[in-house]
Amino acid sequence: YWVETTEADHLREVYEASRPVAAILMLDNYEDLMKACEDTQRSAVLAQIDEKLQTWANAGQGILLKTDRNHYLFLFEEQYFQHFVDEKFSILDTVRAIRVAENIHPTLSIGIGKDSPSIPELYKNAKLSLEMALSRGGDQAVVRNQVDFAFYGGRTKATEKRTKVKSRVMANAFRELIADAGEVY
């Protein structure tokens, strides 16, 4: 006998497409930007960055919240995630194209958590992804799902200025991978 699953398949697709995705965005070199800017230029540069980020986020039909002077939280649905992957997280290039001073350009790191069973775990994976992006030199997007990391961007040369931080970040990421693994050899 046959079982009609069309409606159940459609509901599954709708459910998967509407799953939440969390992204934490961070301006990597915020302090350097502020030092390079004249007082009169700072708010204009930050407004330009905010405008570029908001325009990019609008494609995801989600919400972009500025949580700190150089941190943003972006929440959107899974159905828009592939758009950002297809465009290779073009916001990295868009933000980097803003010129603040000679040889000073803002860079952005993005940590994304997806495919998590709960919102707190989604946020935790986004934070872990951001830490991984920063440990790899910043200026890139890192996506963490339940299994592994995916990396996008990272075209600028990494500057090694946080060796203790990098060691801690890598240790935390390594610990998370071991904790999530079923078997470790």
Predicted feature descriptions by range:
Residues K166-E183:
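Active-site core of bacterial EAL-family cyclic-dinucleotide phosphodiesterase domains
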Residues Y1-D39, S135, V147-K161, R168:
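Sensory coupling linkers of modular signal transduction proteins
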Residues D50-Q61, Q82-P106, S118, Y123-M132:
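Alpha-helical scaffold within the catalytic cores of cyclic-nucleotide enzymes
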Residues R12-Y15, F89-L92, D115-G138, K157-R168:
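Catalytic-core segments of nucleotide cyclases and related cyclic-nucleotide turnover enzymes
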Residues A17-Q79:
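Catalytic NTP-binding/metal-coordinating core of nucleotidyl cyclase/transferase enzymes
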Residues I63-L75, V100-L128, G138-V147:
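A short glycine-enriched loop-to-beta-strand structural element that forms part of the catalytic core
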Residues V21, T107-S109, G182-V184:
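Residues that mark the start of a beta-strand
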